[in-house]
């Protein structure tokens, strides 16, 4: 049997010999490591493995019965915690979830009570939240109160959740058992191809019961997101202008934002959104303060589907200190970071973009892509579109502005994209989205620019925030030093 068996000495025997006072029937049965222990009292114990396993409400996906209550305790081995996420959730909503509910107790001070339907404003559905135990165990309580009308509800099917054991301080990693004589040890793995370990090696578990690196005695390696490598890469197109419809997975870092209006952004890591400062503090005298309602949607190319997936609440908004909202002709410092309340689960439709590390990614004539949900031919689009555009010579953009007697600041912290006589399909609603180029050395897509400003929609150049100029600031913010 694979998994954690053999990793925790004596745990196996103690589980098999442990008395179960709540099970008074010979119908009770045990199967170790992740299989349900069922009792007539509807109390159960699940032992988490490193691979995700399913937990559902009784009868799922059929409508659940009214008048039942069940308690499920999920336990992880020493040195691991339990992580639980909901893939589907559909319970009858009620005020404060006093009716049908799922209650999650992670070992902290407060339990979380959930109800309603995923994506609905009614009740308190789990959305994208991850529930991670503070210790080795997590309890899920499912309650379906009796109904005077019928024992069956024909509207609500219950829930489907995934649970797994994760190494402490390593929320996105898996481990593989190595059952050799001596101290237990594991070979660390991350969830390919979306995460990678920041170090490699075999971990051992000495008598202190703390996992250590066998080479240097360090702590469990951290799994970090893999950036700039879409599972569904773009098909190679000729150097033509205009916009095209993106396929699901082409631009998995694309964010759709709703603040003062629609805008864009890009996922960094699994918790940050890179965007333009002017989407938060618009260059308009009527907007004196930042809108408190900042919504972020991720994981799809269709706005209707994005709304169904739900908003990712924002914990913190950080705007670059050089940005001046009241200077309408100066977009210097037009960059901001949004920290999400919860880490997002990465997958084929949701992956981060990489950040630049050298000037060669800004050479004139280098082709890149910009994507967004902005205006197209005068209409708001509901589908993600993208355009292929070249980095333009700086002198050409300066001359173009001078010919039109424009007074906008074109600083060294900006660059321009496009060609003077060709169509520039970037327009209102694309602000905050990123311009990406392919890094031939690192073999990944890099966000070199942020859609910042332009002169109308149509022909001509677009002007972008140069991300490389702000890399030190980005690192300080993400590391909590700014």
Curated annotation (Swiss-Prot):
Function of the molecule: Mediates the proteolytic cleavage of HP/haptoglobin in the endoplasmic reticulum.
Key word Zinc present: no
GO biological process: complement activation, classical pathway; innate immune response; proteolysis
Protein name: Complement C1r subcomponent-like protein
Glycosylation: residue positions: 358
Cysteine pairs bridged by disulfides in the record: 97-115, 190-223, 397-416, 427-457
Domain Sushi: from-to ranges: 166-225
Tissue-wise expression: Expressed in liver (at protein level).
Gene expressing this chain: C1rl
Enzyme Commission (EC) number: 3.4.21.-
Annotated Gene3D superfamilies: Complement Module, domain 1 (2.10.70.10), Spermadhesin, CUB domain (2.60.120.290), Trypsin-like serine proteases (2.40.10.10)
Keyword field: Complement pathway, Disulfide bond, Glycoprotein, Hydrolase, Immunity, Innate immunity, Protease, Secreted, Serine protease, Signal, Sushi
Signal peptide: 1-43
Active-site residues per Swiss-Prot or TrEMBL entry: 278 (charge relay system), 334 (charge relay system), 431 (charge relay system)
InterPro entries named among the record's database cross-references: CUB_dom, Peptidase_S1_PA, Peptidase_S1_PA_chymotrypsin, Peptidase_S1A, Sperma_CUB_dom_sf, Trypsin_dom, TRYPSIN_SER
Gene Ontology MF terms: serine-type endopeptidase activity
Keyword Signal: yes
UniProt-annotated location(s): Secreted
All copies of domain CUB, residue ranges: 44-166
Family indicated by similarity: Belongs to the peptidase S1 family.
